[in-house]
């Protein structure tokens, strides 16, 4: 079974996850709809089940944009990860489960928006298209959303480890070995910190450009007044 070296910076992004076996073929992602300081015990049990069963990474995800970008950065820096086991509830505001399914099925459009989801802000602005496509190609989604039994997560992880295919939840799972290409490195660029403020069409984009232009003119005018000194500025 071919296993690859991870990128030296693996995992490049910090987050709410447990790092396990770097040669594991599976990562576990549990959707979190609560604040980090209010994580219920049943969610913690699912995360621990993933880690204790041998997942490379096992943790939670709260947002469909920056949070998901961090997940993608971490996964593509380890070619050994070939499955993403997704569990937990749906997040009413973010629709994270729907977003992840849509990403695997449809990818992104020219604006870096995930296609085919009703989530309000499913934009991946801060990572490259190459990383997004590697994530989609390298991984197979094992969808356990709404399952609350840690034993099901354990069985999913176990199934991903097998040398011969086994049936699990309607899928054939086994360890196919590492993705044959070199790991991708990189962290999110933080170019866009608040995706929900980004324009979604040309009309909104034009309004944003005008607002930024006005702000820049006001900034320059204030700078000129400060250089003139109190006498001229005050008339």
Where are these regions (language model features)?
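Conserved mixed alpha/beta catalytic, RNA-binding, or beta-rich assembly cores of soluble enzyme
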Residues: 3-115, 194-197, 205-235
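Divalent-metal-activated hydrolytic enzyme cores
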Residues: 107-191
